[in-house]
């Protein structure tokens, strides 16, 4: 593995150079293997979960359709970000073309927003299941899932589209070294010799509007869920509901917290090492993806039974 660091324009003008850890280049050494393992775990586990849901007829239910959508989003996010990061860590292959960079930027923003929206819909599903169990079959239907999926797709595709468009219209005046492992909007626009105020305002306003509204609805859903669970008389039912919903909420909280810390470190970039938000940005694209199949899948009895039935059929 090489650690060659050359911040001159060593590529053609049509390329950016991804320069991951400017202050701490040794981080590449100890991150390369764990990140590779996390990537394999995330892609493998989500693919397994996705295939289980679609091959096992008993799992053809609204909640599991949403879970399969979450797995698909995780797979796309991992494949969009982590392979390029690993080629930098292992082989120091830092160039990325302008079109590839802006495409990666769009997919990252769009699919992270879709994942946040999917968490919100799944939280609503749990709210209806626990707070209005008798009405659940009439509210959470296949038709509801189709409408929810269309909303997730339309809202986030349209809202995140201006981000790469605004970045692609900037002039970069010969500067092409991105101090990041990925084509994050803030890192790319920092290279421009144009005024990037509109870019940054849209990034923050759009991000807080999408993720903020999702988080508020998620928090409200789990607040009502907690209140309903605490009213249950059966101790076993209370423990089971708290265990399931608690793990779901902790994962969503982790997903949101690491994103919030990433934003705050960008705001306070003079007080923290510039490598910290770079590291958080990379981890944010793989750790939740590795945890989602465990929290939402393996710990769910119906999915475990579905996997066992598929294994028996295969044998």
Curated annotation (Swiss-Prot):
The keyword Iron-sulfur does not apply. One of its GO terms (cellular component) is plasma membrane. Its main location: membrane. SUPFAM superfamilies: Family A G protein-coupled receptor-like. Disulfide bonds join 101-193. The keyword Glycoprotein applies. It comes from the Eukaryota. Keywords: Cell membrane, Disulfide bond, G-protein coupled receptor, Glycoprotein, Membrane, Olfaction, Receptor, Sensory transduction, Transducer, Transmembrane, Transmembrane helix. InterPro entries: GPCR_Rhodpsn (IPR000276), GPCR_Rhodpsn_7TM (IPR017452), Olfact_rcpt (IPR000725), OR51/52/56-like (IPR050402). It is a multi-pass membrane protein. Residues 1-29, 80-103, 165-200, 263-277 are extracellular. Glycans are attached at residues 6, 185. One of its GO terms (molecular function) is G protein-coupled receptor activity. Odorant receptor. This is Olfactory receptor 56A3. It comes from Homo sapiens. The lineage of its organism: Eukaryota, Metazoa, Chordata, Craniata, Vertebrata.
